[in-house]
Amino acid sequence: MLGPLRVLAMLAVLMPFCASAANEKLLVELNSIEGADNRCRLNFVIHNKSDVSLESMKLDLVAFGTDGSILRRLLTEMGPVRAAKTIVRTFAVEAECRQIGSILVNDVTACAPGEPGACLDGLGLSSRLQALRLYK
């Protein structure tokens, strides 16, 4: 059984990420893509608008083809992300960029020091690319 102080401490860590869609504290933007050698580099911009630093933020991403079929699954480490900081992360997918129609954030598998579920709930997503949707 958790004591009251421990519960309060856990809530203090998780609260910044338990936000409504209008007030998300953790934003992930698919900013651009670059093709090279049958691979597609996905460039993400991560905005941590909270006052909590993340040691780790692992996303389970699924790339779907333009026909809706699953192309690839990619486990990514987006962290560490300091509090009130914006960073860029790049990941390569073994597929041509023109084959990718959308990217699903299937799950958040790690979100230290918080809980993955709280990070997923408070995660805001966007894409600068009209032809490539990022969603959860």
Where are these regions (language model features)?
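Bacterial N-terminal signal peptides that target proteins for export
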Residues: 1-8
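N-terminal signal peptide c-region/cleavage motif recognized by signal peptidases
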Residues: 16-18
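Short N-terminal segments immediately surrounding and downstream of signal-peptide cleavage
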Residues: 22-41
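Terminal connector regions
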Residues: 25, 94-136
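Asparagine-centered strand-capping/turn motif at beta-strand->loop junctions
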Residues: 44-51
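Short acidic/proline- and small/hydrophobic-mixed sequence motifs that coincide with surface turns
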Residues: 52-56
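Intrinsically disordered, low-complexity Pro/Gly/Ser/Thr-rich segments with frequent PxxP/GP/PP motifs
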Residues: 64-102, 106, 111
